[in-house]
Regions:
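Intrinsic low-complexity/IDR segments
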Residues: 126-208
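Thr-biased low-complexity repeat/linker tracts and other Thr-enriched repetitive architectures
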Residues: 1-131
């Protein structure tokens, strides 16, 4: 039941199916897939090997490309770009001139906008509100599993942490580290990362 209408174009090996809608001046091309109840409209582009599916909306001048995935109830709009191996999903919103790329994930109720650049192995989650590249900090490989830890600004102008299956405030993170890794080198690593995040992340009223 997919619809393609207006001046929209679907070309090359691209697929649009399910109840997806592509309209306005939107373009879906290369090997891109748009399906489910996804809507791609305005002057938006989905290309490369990118997938947009679920209840997503891709609008304005947004462009999803590379091997990027946008799914769930996520919205990407404005002049935003999602590329490479990045994922945007859940109820996340990426807009403005924001860029999400490399292996970064933006999910939950997170908002990334303005001139923010979210990249590397960042995991921006939950109530994150990132509109400046100084609103998040990633450290890794770190810890007993050589993983990555992401510290990010929230809509309440506080710092939260995502590390593996852990998600919580900065103090909750430190408490968890002490409980799990107390007395080990990993405790030192994580605590140093937390202290560095406090210095690097800019909260409201702080200059860049």
């Amino acid at each position: 039941n997919a619809w393609v209408y207006g001046d929209a174009r679907v070309s090359e090996n691209a697929w649009v199916y399910g109840d997806a809608r592509v309209f306005g001046n939107a373009r879906v091309f290369d090997n891109a897939w748009v399906y489910g109840n996804a809507k791609v409209y305005g002057d938006a582009r989905v290309s490369g090997n990118a997938w947009a599916y679920g209840e997503v909306q891709v609008a304005g001048n947004a462009w999803i490309y590379g091997d990027a995935r946008v799914f769930g109830n996520a919205w990407v709009y404005g002049d935003a770009r999602v590329s490479e191996n990045a994922w945007v999903y859940g109820d996340a919103r990426v807009f403005g001139n924001a860029r999400v790329f490399d292996n970064a994930w933006v999910y939950g109720n997170a908002k990334v906008y303005g001139d923010a650049r979210v990249s590397g192995n960042a995991r921006v989650y939950g109530n994150a509100e990132v509109f400046n590249t100084r609103h998040f900090f990633v450290q890794g490989p770190i810890g007993s599993r050589d993983g990555y830890v992401t510290f990010y600004r929230t809509k309440d102008d506080t710092v939260e942490v995502r590390c593996g299956c852990f998600s919580g405030s900065l103090q909750e993170f430190v408490n968890q580290v002490e409980e799990t890794h107390g007395g080990s080198r990993y405790e030192k690593e994580y605590k140093l990362a937390a202290e560095l995040a406090k210095v690097c992340i800019r909260l409201e009223g702080e200059s860049r």
